């Protein structure tokens, strides 16, 4: 387990039904949770999106089209039926006529700056963990406030602005330990 340590506690393991699941919540490189059962070996963890130069260039192209109002800010909509609400110099505000999403060009410019910063890290071979940092609810790539969903113990990141996402994985043990194994970890009581 790695990253900036934040909080650790034990919970019920879904595989062996013992309170042996060590859940570690980390703040860096982005809000994430990893879990490991100290009795049966069950694991739950997330895998960050693979970023290479081509992927980052595609994301920058997508964001630049959103900055000028050519396409809806929300990938889930993807509409090109956009109206410009306001334009003052380089600042513009837009609204999607299909889903009602509103955004402005300055917010998208800030997202583009963050993605370009990641591109610089890719070019000089630095570790992405140094730049993919986010507050709770933010996309670690573009910084947009997207909210984070939770899947069990894990934090699911699906950015509808730039397309950044993570995958979460679970590894179940091949065999569950016998009843008398791991006496230091209490079993959950059966209901009924």
From Swiss-Prot:
Protein name, per record: Uncharacterized protein aq_1324
**Organism from which the protein derives:** Aquifex aeolicus (strain VF5)
Q: Which domain of life is it from?
A: Bacteria
């Amino acid at each position: 387990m790695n990253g900036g340590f934040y909080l650790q506690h034990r919970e019920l393991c879904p595989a062996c039904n013992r309170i042996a699941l060590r859940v570690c919540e980390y703040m860096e490189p982005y809000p994430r949770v990893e879990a490991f059962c100290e009795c049966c070996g069950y694991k739950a963890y997330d895998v960050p999106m693979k970023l290479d130069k081509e992927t980052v260039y595609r994301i920058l192209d997508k964001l630049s089209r959103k900055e000028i109002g050519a396409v809806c800010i929300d990938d889930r909509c993807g509409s090109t039926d956009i109206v410009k609400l306001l334009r003052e110099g380089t600042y513009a505000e837009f609204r999607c006529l299909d889903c009602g999403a509103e955004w402005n060009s300055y917010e998208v410019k800030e997202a583009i700056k963050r993605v370009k910063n990641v591109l610089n890290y890719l070019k000089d071979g630095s570790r992405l963990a140094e730049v993919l940092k986010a507050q709770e609810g933010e996309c670690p790539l573009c910084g947009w406030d997207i909210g984070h969903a939770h899947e069990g113990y894990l934090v699911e990141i699906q950015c509808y602005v730039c397309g950044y996402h993570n995958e979460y994985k679970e590894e179940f043990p091949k065999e569950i330990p016998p009843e008398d194994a791991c006496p230091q970890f209490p079993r959950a009581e059966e209901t009924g």
